[in-house]
Design a protein with these regions (language model features):
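Recognition helices and adjacent regulatory flanks at domain boundaries
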Residues: 82, 101, 147-150
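Short alpha-helical DNA-recognition segment
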Residues: 102-121
Length: 152
């Protein structure tokens, strides 16, 4: 089984790709080197959407596909390499939990026991949470801390 590790350390199984999906992915790997970020994004979205919509996939299915995730990750890596973006870290995932699961930051803080001031500093990238503090806070809202391999 051949896998691709994305910037967030999540594996994408390449063996599930149809041959034409794999061919497009290989082409996109070459395209990302020669195109600027905006041109690459326009290119990959068009290419992936055209290929998968010909199979009758809905937009939601296209966006949820492995090929879409692969093409998107190539663009993210390109932006990081060129200094246009940064590598995501735990604070991005923490912010996703706050925004996606709670009505307000205050509600998140009440549920986790973190202070609003500390959360504000952490999400603004001025401070870090200690691992034991983060682990305990996440556990209170049904999450756990995991360690993932670095992407190459």
């Amino acid at each position: 089984m051949s896998t691709y590790l994305d910037l967030r350390g999540k594996s994408i199984d390449l063996s599930v790709l149809a041959p034409e999906d794999l061919l497009l992915f290989q082409q996109l790997q070459a395209d990302v080197v020669r195109l600027d970020s905006a041109a690459y994004r326009n290119h990959w979205v068009t290419q992936v959407s055209n290929l998968l919509s010909r199979r009758g996939l809905s937009k939601a299915a296209i966006v949820g596909s492995s090929l879409y995730r692969l093409a998107q990750d190539l663009g993210s890596r390109q932006q990081v390499q060129r200094g246009e973006a940064r590598v995501p870290d735990y604070r991005d995932e923490l912010e996703g939990i706050v925004l996606g699961q709670f009505k307000t930051r205050r509600a998140f803080c009440e549920a986790t026991g973190l202070s609003e001031d500390m959360l504000s500093h952490v999400l603004a990238r001025r401070k870090h949470l200690a691992i034991d503090t983060l682990t305990e806070a996440l556990g209170r809202v049904g999450y756990r801390l995991t360690i993932t391999p670095l992407s190459k």
